Amino acid sequence: MVSPLPLNKRQQGQVYEVMAEQYLQRHHLKPVERNFTCRSGEIDLIMRDKSCVVFVEVKFRKQNHFGSAAEAVNWRKQQKLKRAALLWLKKNSLSTEHTEFRFDVVAIQGPDQQIEWFTNTLVEG
Protein backbone atom coordinates (compact mmCIF):
# COMPACT_ATOMS: atom_id res chain seq x y z
CA MET A 1 0.00 0.00 0.00
CA VAL A 2 1.34 3.42 -0.94
CA SER A 3 1.19 6.11 1.72
CA PRO A 4 -0.17 9.50 0.64
CA LEU A 5 2.40 12.12 -0.28
CA PRO A 6 2.90 14.87 2.28
CA LEU A 7 1.12 18.10 1.46
CA ASN A 8 3.18 21.09 0.40
CA LYS A 9 2.73 24.43 2.20
CA ARG A 10 0.17 25.68 -0.35
CA GLN A 11 -1.93 22.51 -0.01
CA GLN A 12 -1.69 22.66 3.79
CA GLY A 13 -2.84 26.28 3.67
CA GLN A 14 -5.85 25.29 1.58
CA VAL A 15 -6.80 22.60 4.10
CA TYR A 16 -6.73 25.13 6.96
CA GLU A 17 -8.60 27.73 4.91
CA VAL A 18 -11.40 25.21 4.32
CA MET A 19 -11.46 24.41 8.06
CA ALA A 20 -11.66 28.12 8.87
CA GLU A 21 -14.36 28.75 6.28
CA GLN A 22 -16.49 25.88 7.63
CA TYR A 23 -15.98 27.15 11.19
CA LEU A 24 -17.12 30.66 10.20
CA GLN A 25 -20.11 29.25 8.30
CA ARG A 26 -21.16 27.42 11.47
CA HIS A 27 -21.12 30.89 13.07
CA HIS A 28 -23.47 32.21 10.35
CA LEU A 29 -20.95 33.98 8.10
CA LYS A 30 -21.44 33.53 4.35
CA PRO A 31 -18.52 32.84 2.00
CA VAL A 32 -17.87 35.43 -0.71
CA GLU A 33 -14.41 34.62 -2.08
CA ARG A 34 -11.32 32.60 -1.28
CA ASN A 35 -7.69 33.52 -2.00
CA PHE A 36 -8.14 36.99 -3.47
CA THR A 37 -4.69 37.89 -4.80
CA CYS A 38 -3.29 41.22 -5.93
CA ARG A 39 0.09 42.97 -5.98
CA SER A 40 -0.42 44.02 -2.36
CA GLY A 41 -0.87 40.48 -1.14
CA GLU A 42 -3.52 37.84 -0.59
CA ILE A 43 -6.69 37.65 1.45
CA ASP A 44 -7.36 34.07 2.51
CA LEU A 45 -11.13 34.38 2.93
CA ILE A 46 -13.71 37.05 2.28
CA MET A 47 -16.97 36.44 4.12
CA ARG A 48 -20.17 38.31 4.94
CA ASP A 49 -21.50 38.76 8.45
CA LYS A 50 -24.94 40.17 7.69
CA SER A 51 -24.13 43.46 5.92
CA CYS A 52 -20.46 43.51 6.97
CA VAL A 53 -17.70 42.35 4.62
CA VAL A 54 -15.17 40.33 6.64
CA PHE A 55 -11.59 39.93 5.41
CA VAL A 56 -10.09 36.87 7.08
CA GLU A 57 -6.47 35.88 7.56
CA VAL A 58 -6.04 32.17 8.40
CA LYS A 59 -2.94 31.15 10.35
CA PHE A 60 -1.78 27.72 11.50
CA ARG A 61 0.99 26.87 13.91
CA LYS A 62 1.85 23.31 14.84
CA GLN A 63 3.61 24.58 17.98
CA ASN A 64 3.90 27.96 19.62
CA HIS A 65 7.66 28.03 20.26
CA PHE A 66 7.91 31.15 18.09
CA GLY A 67 4.58 32.70 19.05
CA SER A 68 0.99 31.72 18.53
CA ALA A 69 -0.75 31.55 15.17
CA ALA A 70 -2.58 34.79 15.95
CA GLU A 71 0.70 36.55 16.78
CA ALA A 72 1.96 35.74 13.29
CA VAL A 73 -0.32 38.46 11.90
CA ASN A 74 2.06 41.31 12.59
CA TRP A 75 1.79 45.00 11.68
CA ARG A 76 3.38 44.49 8.24
CA LYS A 77 0.97 41.66 7.39
CA GLN A 78 -1.95 43.79 8.59
CA GLN A 79 -0.91 46.63 6.27
CA LYS A 80 -0.76 44.23 3.30
CA LEU A 81 -4.21 42.91 4.19
CA LYS A 82 -5.57 46.44 4.42
CA ARG A 83 -4.20 47.40 0.98
CA ALA A 84 -5.55 44.20 -0.58
CA ALA A 85 -8.95 44.72 1.06
CA LEU A 86 -9.21 48.28 -0.20
CA LEU A 87 -8.43 47.04 -3.71
CA TRP A 88 -11.05 44.27 -3.41
CA LEU A 89 -13.66 46.81 -2.31
CA LYS A 90 -12.78 49.05 -5.26
CA LYS A 91 -12.87 46.14 -7.74
CA ASN A 92 -16.33 45.26 -6.44
CA SER A 93 -17.59 48.86 -6.69
CA LEU A 94 -17.92 49.20 -2.92
CA SER A 95 -16.87 52.41 -1.21
CA THR A 96 -15.12 52.47 2.13
CA GLU A 97 -17.50 55.23 3.24
CA HIS A 98 -20.66 53.21 2.57
CA THR A 99 -19.49 49.65 3.18
CA GLU A 100 -19.10 48.15 6.63
CA PHE A 101 -16.02 45.93 6.77
CA ARG A 102 -13.61 44.44 9.28
CA PHE A 103 -10.53 42.23 9.54
CA ASP A 104 -10.64 38.92 11.41
CA VAL A 105 -8.03 36.27 12.15
CA VAL A 106 -8.78 32.57 12.44
CA ALA A 107 -5.88 30.91 14.26
CA ILE A 108 -5.54 27.14 14.13
CA GLN A 109 -3.08 25.89 16.72
CA GLY A 110 -1.41 22.68 17.75
CA PRO A 111 -1.71 19.02 16.86
CA ASP A 112 -5.38 19.02 17.94
CA GLN A 113 -6.04 21.94 15.52
CA GLN A 114 -7.80 24.11 18.08
CA ILE A 115 -9.53 27.06 16.38
CA GLU A 116 -9.62 30.59 17.78
CA TRP A 117 -11.49 33.40 16.03
CA PHE A 118 -10.42 37.00 16.62
CA THR A 119 -12.75 39.67 15.25
CA ASN A 120 -11.94 43.21 14.19
CA THR A 121 -8.19 42.75 14.60
CA LEU A 122 -6.66 45.47 12.43
CA VAL A 123 -4.34 47.84 14.27
CA GLU A 124 -4.48 51.34 12.81
CA GLY A 125 -1.35 53.36 12.20
Curated annotation (Swiss-Prot):
PANTHER family documented for this protein: UPF0102 PROTEIN YRAN
Family: Belongs to the UPF0102 family.
SUPFAM superfamilies to which the protein is assigned, alphabetical: Restriction endonuclease-like
Record InterPro entries: Restrct_endonuc-II-like, tRNA_endonuc-like_dom_sf, UPF0102_YraN-like
Lineage: Bacteria, Pseudomonadati, Pseudomonadota, Gammaproteobacteria, Vibrionales
Pfam families linked to this entry: UPF0102
The protein's name in its UniProt record: UPF0102 protein PBPRA3228
UniProt superkingdom: Bacteria
